[in-house]
Amino acid sequence: MLVDRTTSRAEVMTPRGYDEPETSHTGFNTLRSDRETVGRAYTIEWPSGWCKLTDVSSARSVGVDASFKNPRDEASTLAVFISDAGSRRSVADQGSLDKVAASRADSAPRQVTVGKRRRKTKVGENGTEALTYDVETKVGGGTAGRFGSAVELVGITVVGGKEYLIRATASASSWPEERARLRRCVESFRILETD
């Protein structure tokens, strides 16, 4: 007996305000910031198959310098936020890693820190590095909206009077499969210019 098996693919809808998904055989695309960035020039990897924010100029008015979204899972996002650092010359001027992690967890009800670490971010081509704090938090219930519970990973670096906050998010249910990929993106952030 012959059985006709036809497969159907769910149509992937490009999120409103985002470009069509970009793909790369390496599994990652690379963004080099444009001249309009509010900070120094930088690069960051973002997952293949994801969409890039179309109108970055209007997003910059609220501190978003780049934004990416998984069209198959709208809770999975990656964004670069740039803001004035005031008198801070390093992320350490904001406090210890423990203090910064506690502050991020306290920023929303039912949010807890699930990971934290120090690392270095490359600045320029001469071997200069800046201290970066990575903080991973999980938030549950109403705060995460229709996604139920969610996980957020941020990398925070201060250089040249600017704070660069790289934020990756995913629903808690998709985090186990997204974690390595999103961590790679957060860690790929590099500042291209030095003082």
What annotation goes with each model-predicted range?
Residues 1-90, 94, 109-126, 137-148, ...:
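N-terminal targeting sequences that direct proteins away from the cytosol to non-cytosolic compartments
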